[in-house]
Amino acid sequence: MNHWLVKSEPESYSFAQFQKDKTTAWTGVRSFPARIFLRQMAKGDEVFVYHSVSEKAVVGVATVIKTAYPDPTVEPDEKGEWVCVDLKAGKALPKPVLLAAIKSNRAFKDIQLVRQSRLSVAPLTEKESAELRKLGGL
């Protein structure tokens, strides 16, 4: 099993809404590196959801339930073969893991969230995902 981090603006699509929906297609990703990562996701992979912009915290966990397929939100004039995956919402973290805590923790010294902060989908190491679970109270 691999581990991933995806970003969402809570004003657009919060983890609480995701939990109400139970599942969602993770659409709208328009970054070439992120597209590569979406294509690498496998059914059953663990996905941490990060609220960007206002909250700046890892807030919940999800699972990949359908691997990459063509993103239905692509406009006809858009360049690129954009994809999405389907995710199933899991638990909200009892203690959201703030970006400041991630930046100050040596376990995250190489985490993509900090090194490539504009990337909306990124892999996590086993060590990083274990530390997120620990800090988040899971």
Predicted segments with their positions:
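GIY-YIG nuclease signature motif recognition
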Residues: 6, 62-65, 125
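Short, charged, solvent-exposed linker or helix-capping segments at domain edges/interfaces
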Residues: 17, 96-102, 133-135
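Hydrophobic beta-strand signal
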Residues: 48-49, 63
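Short, charged beta-turn/beta-strand-edge "cap" motif at the junction between a beta-strand
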Residues: 50-56
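Aromatic- and Lys/Arg-enriched surface recognition patch
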Residues: 61-119
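Charged phosphate-binding loop/patch that engages nucleotide di/tri-phosphates or the phosphate backbone
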Residues: 120-138
